[in-house]
């Protein structure tokens, strides 16, 4: 009986050891990817913040009617959701999906969705939520190529009045253990009051450059979301894999203890049987 128990525990020890090797390797890979993602995030964040300042000045000094500021009359809302292509990253994806569901549940008829990432597409399909477009297999370091494709699609949907508001839903990265889901409205722009002592002259007139300015701003904004999303994904995966490795270590300690106790019990029983047999021979 003890022998069968020892064999079962030995199998479990082997299984947990193999799992620990996988989680440890994935944790190391995620750590390396996170380091690269954080460098990319810092670079993109500087560019994005500077472009926001420039755009703010441009928007505030546009006096002519413009659909990108005044709206286009459509009541449809577009949500662009940033999720991951791979799993095993804790609650990273489900937190984003839950926030989207809470946003659209009050007005499903006027809510449209573009999803980025295999996992987001899978969750939305299970929930019966249709998507306007899907973008998958985004590289670990996203480029302007991916951002431009999405930006052009957003501009097309907005300028054709298929959507009247555009929101980006992504995970803002603060640290490997802290990320926050944000819902950022990017269209139409919010115009602020002009400063009385500030005057900017644009040449050529800014209205002639509006389409180019809009596309560049959307590219910068989408790249910023990509960078935050990739850093958050890898931070969540690193934390999840490190936690899984720690749990595997604890489980192995318990299994080793059970194995040693069972083996000791088997040895004690065997010695008792030998002694008992010897006594019977007398």
Curated annotation (Swiss-Prot):
Q: Which domain of life is it from?
A: Bacteria
- Quote the subcellular location field of this record: Cell membrane
Q: Which family does it belong to?
A: Belongs to the ATPase gamma chain family.
UniProt main location, coarse: membrane
Molecular-function GO terms, alphabetical: ATP binding; proton-transporting ATP synthase activity, rotational mechanism
Q: Which NCBIfam families match?
A: ATPsyn_F1gamma
User: What's the source species for this entry?
Assistant: Clostridium botulinum (strain Kyoto / Type A2)
The gene for this chain is atpG
Gene3D superfamilies of this UniProt entry?
A: 3.40.1380.10, ATP synthase, gamma subunit, helix hairpin domain
Q: How does it assemble?
A: F-type ATPases have 2 components, CF(1) - the catalytic core - and CF(0) - the membrane proton channel. CF(1) has five subunits: alpha(3), beta(3), gamma(1), delta(1), epsilon(1). CF(0) has three main subunits: a, b and c.
Q: Which keywords does this chain's UniProt record carry?
A: ATP synthesis, Cell membrane, CF(1), Hydrogen ion transport, Ion transport, Membrane, Transport
What's the protein name?
A: ATP synthase gamma chain
Question: Does the keyword Membrane feature in the UniProt annotation?
Answer: yes
What this chain does, per the entry, is described as:
Produces ATP from ADP in the presence of a proton gradient across the membrane. The gamma chain is believed to be important in regulating ATPase activity and the flow of protons through the CF(0) complex.
The Gene Ontology biological process terms listed for this entry are: proton motive force-driven plasma membrane ATP synthesis
Keyword Metal-binding among UniProt keywords: no
Q: What cellular-component terms does GO give this entry?
A: plasma membrane; proton-transporting ATP synthase complex
Q: Which PROSITE patterns match?
A: ATPASE_GAMMA
Topology relative to the lipid bilayer, per the entry, is: Peripheral membrane protein
């Amino acid at each position: 009986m003890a022998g069968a128990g020892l064999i079962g525990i030995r199998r479990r020890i082997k299984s947990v050891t193999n799992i620990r090797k996988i989680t440890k390797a994935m944790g190391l890979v995620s750590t390396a990817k996170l380091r690269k993602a954080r460098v990319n995030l810092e670079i993109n964040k500087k560019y994005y913040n500077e472009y926001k300042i420039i755009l703010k000045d441009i928007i505030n000094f546009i006096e002519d009617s413009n659909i990108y500021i005044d709206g286009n009359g459509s009541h449809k809302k577009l949500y662009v959701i940033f999720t991951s292509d791979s799993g095993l990253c804790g609650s990273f994806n489900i937190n984003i999906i839950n926030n989207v569901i809470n946003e659209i549940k009050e007005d499903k008829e006027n809510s449209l969705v573009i999803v980025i990432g295999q996992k987001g597409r899978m969750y939305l399909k299970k929930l019966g939520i249709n998507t306007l477009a899907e973008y998958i297999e985004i590289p670990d370091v996203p480029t302007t190529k991916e951002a431009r494709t999405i930006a052009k699609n957003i501009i097309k949907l907005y300028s054709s009045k298929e959507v009247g508001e555009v929101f980006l839903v992504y995970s803002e990265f603060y640290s490997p253990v802290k990320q926050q889901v944000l819902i950022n409205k990017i269209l139409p722009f919010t115009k602020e009051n002009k400063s009385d002592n500030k005057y900017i002259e644009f040449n050529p007139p800014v209205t002639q450059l509006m389409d180019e300015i809009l596309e560049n701003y959307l590219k910068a904004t989408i790249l910023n979301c990509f960078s935050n999303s990739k850093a958050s994904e890898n931070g969540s995966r690193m934390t999840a894999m490190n936690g899984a490795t720690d749990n595997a270590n604890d489980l192995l300690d318990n299994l080793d203890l059970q194995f040693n106790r069972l083996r000791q019990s088997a040895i004690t029983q065997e010695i008792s049987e030998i002694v008992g047999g010897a006594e019977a021979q007398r």
